[in-house]
A protein has these predicted regions:
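A solvent-exposed, acidic/Ser-Thr-rich amphipathic alpha-helical stretch
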Residues: 18-22, 26-70
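Short solvent-exposed loop/turn micro-motifs enriched in small/polar/acidic residues
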Residues: 4, 57-59, 94-97
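Short, low-complexity N-terminal intrinsically disordered segments enriched in polar/charged residues
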Residues: 1-27, 129-131
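Low-complexity, intrinsically disordered terminal/linker segments enriched in charged
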Residues: 111-131
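Short, solvent-exposed coil/turn segments at beta-strand boundaries
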Residues: 67-71, 103-110
Length: 131
């Protein structure tokens, strides 16, 4: 069940369906980013909306998944195109990075979504677009 819920959550991410993501979150859902920062609802809902504005073609690709009990580990890649304040997608702002996600589920919903990834590719693009 945990891997089914985790894959549904990934589908909602790839669809940029924040409402669908929220429907799959527990009331006390926590998102943990690659720096270890923890975010909870409703801040995480605003955060996803802002992220999809910043990377309008953000995607997650799962290559392998492992599940034990209520924990799923998803291995794959994430990527997209960073869009600066001007809202223009430029090929040079495209990025992709390996990533691992850990989904902890409870009662058919995602209680914690944690990502381990190297975000330096997108940070470098952001720094370049500011200068």
């Amino acid at each position: 069940m945990s891997s089914v819920v985790a894959r549904r959550f990934v589908k909602k991410i790839n669809d940029h369906d924040v409402g669908g993501m929220v429907a799959l979150m527990t009331a006390d859902h926590t998102f943990v980013d690659s720096l270890g920062e923890r975010f909870s609802r409703p801040a995480i809902e605003r955060g996803w909306k802002q992220y999809f504005d910043m990377v309008p073609n953000y995607w997650v690709k799962i290559d392998r998944a492992f599940t034990e009990g209520k924990v799923s580990i998803l291995i794959g890649r994430a990527g997209g195109t960073y869009v600066s304040g001007k809202g223009v997608e430029r090929p040079e702002n495209n990025w992709e990075t390996p990533a691992v996600w850990v989904a902890r589920t409870r009662d058919g919903k995602v209680a914690e979504w944690r990502i381990y990834s190297d975000n330096e590719p997108v940070r470098a693009i952001m720094r370049k677009s500011i200068s």
